[in-house]
């Protein structure tokens, strides 16, 4: 006998695959945000070091103002990227939860299928044993005649 929930099991498998894909996609986006954040941090450190070098000795007001405005831009950019990173981490966590849920559903369906197959095998063995018992009883009765 065929497992009647097989189409549902297949849907669960496809749903799990979709969840895996979405999780990987979100993780790639998070990784790119983290790389961008690292690049901004590196650029900020370079700019601060440069301003410190240039600021020693004579001070050029134009250079100082443009450097500090660029630094404030970099700091603002870092805040924006950090907010995007936090948001993306939440999306990754949600995708991970969806994947865990999909795996549980698939494993439940597979367990149901496994139990169904065990019952079917047991029933088939019982039918076969019953048939063999009937054949044996028939042979015994034939031998008594």
Predicted stretch roles:
Residues 1-145:
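Charge-rich amphipathic alpha-helical interaction elements
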């Amino acid at each position: 006998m065929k497992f009647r929930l097989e189409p549902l099991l297949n849907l669960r498998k496809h749903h799990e695959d979709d969840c895996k894909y979405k999780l990987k996609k979100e993780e790639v986006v998070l990784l790119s945000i983290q790389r961008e954040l690292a690049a901004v941090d590196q650029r900020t450190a370079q700019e601060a070091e440069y301003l410190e070098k240039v600021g020693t000795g004579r001070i050029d007001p134009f250079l100082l103002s443009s450097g500090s405005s660029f630094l404030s831009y970099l700091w603002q950019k870092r805040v924006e990227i950090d907010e995007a990173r936090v948001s993306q981490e939440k999306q990754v966590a949600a995708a991970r939860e969806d994947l865990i849920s999909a795996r549980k559903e698939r494993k439940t369906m597979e367990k149901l299928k496994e139990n169904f197959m065990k019952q079917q095998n047991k029933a088939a063995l019982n039918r076969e044993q019953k048939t063999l018992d009937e054949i044996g009883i028939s042979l015994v009765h034939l031998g008594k005649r």
